[in-house]
Structures are given as structure tokens and as C-alpha cells.
Amino acid sequence: GGYDRKRDLEDAMLCAAPGMKKNGFLRLGGGEFSLPYTVICGCHPRKTVLITAAVHGGEYVGIQAAVELADKLKPEKIHGRVILVKTVCRKEFEERSGSICPEDEKNLNRVFPGNPQGTRMDRLAYEVVQKLHSAADYYIDLHSGDDYEQLTPYIYYAGCADEDVVQMSRKMAEQADVPYMVKSNVASGGSYNYAAACGIPSVLIERGQMGGWSPEEVHSTRKDVRNILCALGVYDGMRS
């Protein structure tokens, strides 16, 4: 009847045994997209936090922070589940094409919620919504400045959503050690904006610039994420 083996397989990829960590490639869109990911399941059931990097393929601070978080977060300290997708725009990252997909000349973070019948970025956005947003209770999206962007570290929080979602998004943003906090005023286009409009408290961290990264920037982003996880009760520990 309604048995969908492919969908069941995709759902199973986002699960691990309690107290375990699983690494692999998440196949989306019938195999069109293959995204490196880690899922860490704690021993205690609670909420799921989705963390994504490389929604823009040339923003390296978030990628390296996600790689290190996947390595350093300890399953025994997790209450719930953490899903880390280390490179959403994997092909664009590998081809060093920055924030624009050469195939359709679209910016992934402008086309959410996507369209399964659209061009490449439309299809990827649709798959992210269907398979990743749908699994999340909270969402942290990691960005930095592309090779033409200078910026001071800051954090966006969702502003166009139900009031309880906005307030929780702001609470998440307050955990980040950045000079500026910005309330978003759009409900679609961006991955985290659309997730929030669907009821998922969401933030976007910006740190790093001009297509570069440093160990200090990566460490700061890791610390911000850890502090958000602690504030959500998903990770054991004190604010650092």
C-alpha cells in the first residue's frame, strides 16, 4: 500500500542507536544529491537539533566548525539528537563556485521552500525541507563571508513566525558571542527563515569573511553552537 522503501531508507539514515554517532552520505532526490552528514543520538529522548553548513559552498568557517562539532560532540552528553549536515551545496563546494550554482545561476538561500519540478537549487531546497527541516525541532545554519564579503560576526534570528517561535529563536541567538543580533523580517527564501515559518525556532550565524577561515573563527562558532545546545537542554554542560 503506502510503503515507501526509499523514504524509509532516508529516514533511517538520520537515526542512530542511543549513545551512538553515525557518519555517512545522505542521499536526497533519488540520489541526485549526496550530502556528508553525522547524526549523534543521546541515551535520553528529547528534541532534535539540525545544524547545516555550506548552504553557500564557499563559506568555510561553518564547514570546518561542523566537521569539528561532529568529531567533538559526545553522545553521552546529548539529550535527544543532533544532525550535522557538513556541506549542503557539496557540488558547488567542490567546484569552488561560491554562493551561486553555475547550472541554474541560483542562490540556494533565496529559493526556499523549493520546487521538486524546478531547477537544481529549487530541487535541493525542496529536499532539504522535506527530509531535514521535517526532522528538526530547532535549527542552526552556519555561514560566513564569501570571497567578496567583508563582515563583522553577527547572528540572525527568525522574526516572521509565530511569537513563541520568534522568542525561542531570540533565546538561541542570545547564546552566541557576537557583537550584533539581527531580527529577520522575511519568512521564505532562506533555509532558516522558511523553517521558522513552519514552526522551527531557527538562527543563522555569520562569522568569517572574504572566503577564508581561521582556527579562532572556527573555535568561536563551535562554542556558539555548543552554548545554544546547552541552553536548549540538548547538551550537558555550562555556558563557556
Model-derived regions: residue spans:
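Structured catalytic-domain cores with a bias toward divalent-metal coordination
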Residues: G1-S240
